[in-house]
Amino acid sequence: MSSTYGENLKLTIFGQSHSPAIGVTIEGIPAGEKVDLDELQRFLSRRAPGKNAWSTPRKEADAPEILSGLVNGHTCGAPLTAIIRNTNTRSQDYANLAVTPRPGHADYTAEVKYGGYQDRAGGGHFSGRLTAPLCIAGGICLQLLAREGIAVVSRIASIAGICDEGELTSSTVEKDFPVVSDACGEKMRAAIAQAREEGDSVGGVVECAVFGAPAGLGDPMFGGMENRIAAALFGIPAVKGVEFGAGFGASKLRGSENNDAFSVENGKIVTETNHCGGILGGITDGMPIVLRAAFKPTPSIARTQQSVNLQSVTREELAITGRHDPCIVPRAVPCVEAAVAVAVYDALLARRKETR
């Protein structure tokens, strides 16, 4: 399985949804970097399940155990490995999936790829549970970036077609339901509650911005910042689309509308607009990096769905049990921040090598 990301900062995520533990090994962080474990725990708690009405009932503390790479609160240059114990699993809920794949999940494709040897319980290595170790890596990178004057912030841009209002700024949206407009948030929560009541689920979009990233990060073509960030984001289960700046909306504009005019502000080169999302030719231009990630509705729903029996190769109805989110978007916000932070810090390390 391909569960390793990065070049200068390299992380490998391991474990399954119902294995004894899940975790991450991070290589490339310079020795001597302070890691605030209390701050890391606060970040992980934003993603943790079982805290509210729009989350899965599965409760996990998501408390990281640092096994290596950290001495007296500072990185020591060795690979940093951390795990999170899985303490609230119910593998019996997935017993019928051996022959009947869930629509919208990776059950069928995993069966084809791994010949039935894959761990099916809770989705195994394909589970959103694996975003917890991603958030360990991302939470550490957020601390390292903050010391460089770089902030990564996100919000819920939309859920079930209901859009947030207002602008995302460099101030973190410190809310359990991270929207700028509380009125819009109430409408989104109502849509989630209705979907849950109807045995269904809804999706949405997370918007993320990186403030303070210097110009010059990234490379042309396949090493571009869009490529690096998108690769990390698509490692989050349920992400089905990523756009930067004006994104697909740019296709509706004329060049005279889409081009970001250059200007000077306090002796610094800036652009008057930011349709490019802070990236030109795969390289950051010093403006905020702005992106949006689209999340599909949670595929595990309470309604009976059409599937097939893989043994008899016949159509078969499937009723899914287990504990699932009616909408994963609120818990995905820190996951997006984590993925983006990892990608930006990896690019920052690359830039340091180039400019030595």
Where are these regions (language model features)?
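Alpha-helical support elements that line or immediately flank enzyme active sites
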Residues: 20-32, 128-150, 223-231, 287-297, ...
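Internal helix-turn-beta structural module
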Residues: 10, 300-356
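Glycine-rich, N-terminal phosphate-binding loop and its surrounding beta-alpha-beta segment
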Residues: 44-103, 107-109
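N-terminal, positively charged regions that mediate nucleic acid binding
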Residues: 1-58
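Short acidic, glycine/tyrosine-flanked loop/strand segments centered on an H-E-D-like triad
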Residues: 98-124, 306-324
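Glycine-rich, mobile lid/loop segments that gate access to catalytic sites or pores
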Residues: 113-221
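Glycine-rich anion/phosphate-binding loop at the beta-strand->alpha-helix junction
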Residues: 14, 20, 135, 199-202, ...
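A short glycine/serine-rich beta->alpha loop
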Residues: 10-15, 118-130, 215-219, 276-279, ...
